[in-house]
Amino acid sequence: MAYVKERIYESMFIIAPNVPEEEREKLVERVKGIIEERVKGKIDKVERMGMRKFAYEIKKFSEGDYTVIYFRCDGQHLQELENFYRITPEIIRWQTFRRFDLEKKERKAQREKAAAEAIESSEGGSEA
């Protein structure tokens, strides 16, 4: 079996404003559960942005409750999350995309850390 590299994704979804706050919280928890169980991802960060006004109406609503979730997965089961969004009427808009910028930043930090460790170990070895 080939190794598939873990990628960083951002998933933003908007919950209809007529859904009670308690139900919105449960819906966010369900999305997190789907990411962890079905998508086999690891959640890095959940941002509840709250109610925001839209620039234009979406499904006859002028505002909605925004949530952004950053997570890591191999991308093979990402369609499970999209299917959940599609069949959930309380979620009126969603978008999931890969964050190349965050992946690049993480790789750079790893390279710098490895270089610093290499310098540290070579300096430590010459003292003996």
Swiss-Prot record:
Matching entries from Pfam families are given as: Ribosomal_S6 (PF01250)
Q: Does the keyword RNA-binding apply?
A: yes
Its function? Binds together with bS18 to 16S ribosomal RNA.
| InterPro entries from the UniProt entry | Ribosomal_bS6, Ribosomal_bS6_sf, Ribosomal_S6_plastid/chlpt, Transl_elong_EF1B/ribsomal_bS6
Give the originating organism.
Thermotoga sp. (strain RQ2)
Asked if the record carries the keyword Translocase, the reply is: no
State the name under which the record lists this protein: Small ribosomal subunit protein bS6
Instruction: State the family it belongs to.
Output: Belongs to the bacterial ribosomal protein bS6 family.
An example Gene Ontology CC term for this record? cytoplasm
Question: Which keywords, in A-to-Z order, does the entry hold?
Answer: Ribonucleoprotein, Ribosomal protein, RNA-binding, rRNA-binding
Q: Could you state a single Gene Ontology molecular function term?
A: structural constituent of ribosome
What GO biological process terms does the UniProt entry carry, in alphabetical order?
translation
Q: Which NCBIfam families match?
A: S6 (TIGR00166)
